[in-house]
Structure formats: structure tokens, C-alpha cells
Amino acid sequence: MKKWTKTALLTGCACCIAGAVLMFSGWASGGKAYAETYDLNAMSGSAKKEDGISTQEKIKLDDFDELQADLTIGDLNILPSGDDSCYLAWRIPSKKGETAVEYRVRDGVLSIEETSAVSDTIYINIDFTEENLSGGKQSETGVILYVPEKKVLKKIEVTMGFGDVQMNGIHAESGRLQNADGDITLFGCDMQNIKCKADYGDVELKSGTWENGSITLEDGDAKIQNTKLSGDVSVENSYGDIELELGKKDLERLEITAKTDFGEIDVPDTMENLMQKEEDEQSFSYVPDQPAGRITLMTKDGDISLEND
């Protein structure tokens, strides 16, 4: 081994040991409590996290039948309210803890958007260290909208910047879901005529219904599980996999077209004879006697999986 290589390795090992010692010393002398209380992103060592967080406890809203949400930082969760009313709450980083969200209900439309206290702030997050120092505890930020379980939204328009979208038991007749950097997850939702787009993130539909509409991904995976599909449905992906997992009867009642430019297609044994392969490209087509709907699955670089449970 060359002398300089040995010296570099020894120096690296020494730095790792020194770093571990310093980290343990910081944790033992109260670093855990500090990481839980103070803002690691602030220039001041005395700045507390809550000083830079805009918090709104659950507040009751007027009734509405359309939603427009435009958010940049944090997650958006839409959940059942448990009663006949709608509520809104949030916890979002903002300048000096100023109000981060503006909302209003006008002509049956609920609009939710961030204020300048968020958009005028450059937020560089180093809180990845917080999870290690605080024993796995990490603050969640975002907006939570609560709606009645049986409420049907005529239209839903959601535009996200950096954060995840999660909806539980939501009913919508039309709309658009768009996320620049984050996942979109729908549990037990009944959706019609929805255009869903994720630039960098996954899309998952589970235990609901999806009638007409499209799902488009640039870099992420799409998973549709135990979801009743009808009408014309398309899933297009640039870099990522597509997984369709339905009951045997539900899968066999769909007209299915699948194609991948660079990847593999995995189908149930009873459909293997419908596969077509040509170098890296694979395709699949299935047409039942009386289709309940049509789904098109396309990915440029990724695998496609069809499963019947």
C-alpha cells in the first residue's frame, strides 16, 4: 500500500472516531433535548422550533363542494371529520411564525394557499440530523383538511410543491392532483374523471374506486391495489414500475393494454400466452367478452406487474 494511501485511510478513520466521540458527547450532555426543542435550521443557537412554525388548531369551516389547494411546503392530508362538519388545521414553517395559510369559502369553493410568510422564506432543511439526535422523533408539517365521510366534492384541484398528499375516504367527481416532489396516496377513495400527476414521487390507489381519468409519473412507481376500475383509465410512467393488483374477477373483466420499452411484464399464468416480446420491449393485450372498463399501462423504463389475489 502506498504511503499516502495509508495516511489518508488512517486520517479518515481518526476523523470518524472523533466524530462519533463528539456526537456521543453532545447527546450525553443534552443534545437530544436540544434537537427536540431548538431549530437546527436557524442561524441563532437560541431559536426555538416553535418560533418559526405557524400553527392552527382544528377550526370549523363553512360548507363547500369544491376544493382548490396550492401548497409548497409540507404535506396535505384530507381525512374524515367524524361528523357532519368540515375543519382545517395546519403546522407549517414560516417567517417568525407568521400565519402561513390563507383560506376562504366563497360560492361553495374552499381555497387554501400559502401566504408570503412561507413563499418569501428560503428554507434549507438540515433536520435529517434531528432524527438521529432526538431518538427518531421528527416534527410533521403540513395541512390537514377534515370532511364528512359521505361528502361528495364536485371538483378537487390540488397543486403541491414539496410534500406528500394523502386522502382517506374522499369522494370526488372531477379534478386534478399534481405533485412536484412527493407521493400521492389514496385510501378508500371514490374518484371520477381525475387527472393525477407526480413528477418525483409514487402514486398509490388502495381499496377504492376509480372511474375514468389518468395517472402520469415522471420518476416514481405506481401501484393500484384492490381498487375497482371502470371507464377509460391510463397509467403512464417514464422511469418506474407499474403494479396492478386486483381480485381475479375484477382483473379479468378489464380490457388491458400494457407496454414497456425497457423492462419486463409479469402477468398471471392464465394470461401468459398473450405476451409479446421483442428485444427489450414487451407488450400485453387482453380483451374480455364484455369489458367493465379499459386500462392502459405504459412505462418507458420499468416493469409492469399484473396480479390477481
Task: Walk through the language-model features, giving the residues of each.
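Short, hydrophobic/aromatic-rich segments at coil-to-beta transitions
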Residues: Y87, K154-I156, S230-G231
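Internal hydrophobic scaffold segments of catalytic domains
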Residues: C15-A20, P93-L110, K248-K249, E255-T257
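Right-handed parallel beta-helix
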Residues: G52-E66, D75-D83, K96-Q192, K197, ...
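Short Gly/aromatic-enriched secondary-structure transition segments
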Residues: D83-P93
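Detector for the N-terminal beta1/A-loop initiation region of ABC nucleotide-binding domains
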Residues: T72, D199, S238
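Alpha-helical transmembrane segments and their membrane-interface anchoring/capping motifs
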Residues: M1-D83, N125, P268-N273, E307-D309
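Short, flexible beta-strand-to-coil junctions
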Residues: L71-T72, R91-K95
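Short, surface-exposed interaction patches in beta-rich subdomains
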Residues: F187-G188, N193-I194, V203-D309
